[in-house]
Amino acid sequence: MSKGEIMNRLATSKEDILAASRELIRENGWAAVSIRSVAAKCSVSAGTIYNYYESKAELLGATIESVWQEIFFHPEDEQVFHDVTTCISWIYERFQYGNKRFPGFFSLHSFGFMKEGKDDGKKRMMRTWGHILNGLCEVLKNDHKIRPGVFDENFTEMQFAEILFSLMLVSVIREDYDPSSCLLYTSDAADEL
């Protein structure tokens, strides 16, 4: 083992591993991520990667979660979270950014990965989606343009957020990053609620 490899082993962190994994996804799609390919990208042995992740499934789950986090980092303009229409437009912009930065990440094949018995990956994705849903709920609660009393125990902010997010996911799968349909639905629904 060379001195450079020893130094690299000591310098490798989960963040470095996830950054290398994201780079592999950008270059070759998420199927390119494996223990060996990430180790090669980090210039470390596969054993070093196994020190952090027990399996390829665990590495993929963590990588997918980190991609979602990169896509949905908090904006510099916190006003995004005070207005439902601005927030929805921002989410669509972030989906479009994610598609450009990580081509194919949102494909049905990627979503299928989460259904193949990879419980850790599915939990991580659901946690990330939960974060997005909770954010939408907060925006719905705090938007001064939403009529007071529009939500109650029969139709909650979370139920409406789930409908909106479902519409967004369908748009993403179709690679349609125009928020106008979702915004129209939001406007119509808010008027009728």
Short names for language-model regions:
Residues 1-12, 149-151:
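N-terminal intrinsically disordered/low-complexity leader segments
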Residues 16, 20, 24-58, 62:
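Helix-turn-helix
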Residues 62, 76-101, 157-161:
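Hydrophobic alpha-helical connector segments
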Residues 65-70:
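Short, basic, alpha-helical segments at the C-terminal edge of helix-turn-helix-like DNA-binding modules
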Residues 96-135:
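Short secondary-structure transition hinges
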Residues 109, 164-168:
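Short alpha-helical scaffolding segments that buttress acidic/His motifs in well-ordered protein cores
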Residues 117-118, 129-161:
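Hydrophobic alpha-helical bundle segments that form small-molecule/ligand-binding pockets
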Residues 185-193:
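Conserved small/polar residues in nucleotide/adenosyl-binding loops
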